[in-house]
């Protein structure tokens, strides 16, 4: 992302009554906040954030830049407040997704379900081990 264009695009943009954070600051804060997540969620979240920021580093459309940063800033607030476990998407938000975004969301959902199942299996193994001792 071109820094001049970003700052020009974001300069007056507000979201939830706050100025949008510059991309690098936002990226670092998200990764720092991920350190508080359980291991598997942290790994998956870090990888996803890195990929998304890499994929969007060359965008030059001001509306896309503001939308991208606003969405990630909302995510940062959600995980900072511990609301990530109960988060849901509204039907309005789902309808606004492009076909590519819908596929990406579906893949993310499958990965999180797999992660959840793996965690349950590990937990049951731990319980069995503790019962044997």
Curated annotation (Swiss-Prot):
It comes from Saccharomyces cerevisiae (strain ATCC 204508 / S288c). The lineage of its organism: Eukaryota, Fungi, Dikarya, Ascomycota, Saccharomycotina. Residues 1-12 form a transit peptide. Present with 195 molecules/cell in log phase SD medium. Pfam families: Complex1_LYR_2 (PF13233). The gene is SDH7. It comes from the Eukaryota. This is Succinate dehydrogenase assembly factor 3, mitochondrial. The keyword Chaperone applies. The keyword Cell cycle does not apply. GO terms for cellular component: mitochondrial intermembrane space; mitochondrial matrix; mitochondrion. Plays an essential role in the assembly of succinate dehydrogenase (SDH), an enzyme complex (also referred to as respiratory complex II) that is a component of both the tricarboxylic acid (TCA) cycle and the mitochondrial electron transport chain, and which couples the oxidation of succinate to fumarate with the reduction of ubiquinone (coenzyme Q) to ubiquinol. Promotes maturation of the iron-sulfur protein subunit SDH2 of the SDH catalytic dimer, protecting it from the deleterious effects of oxidants. Acts together with SDHAF1 (SDH6).
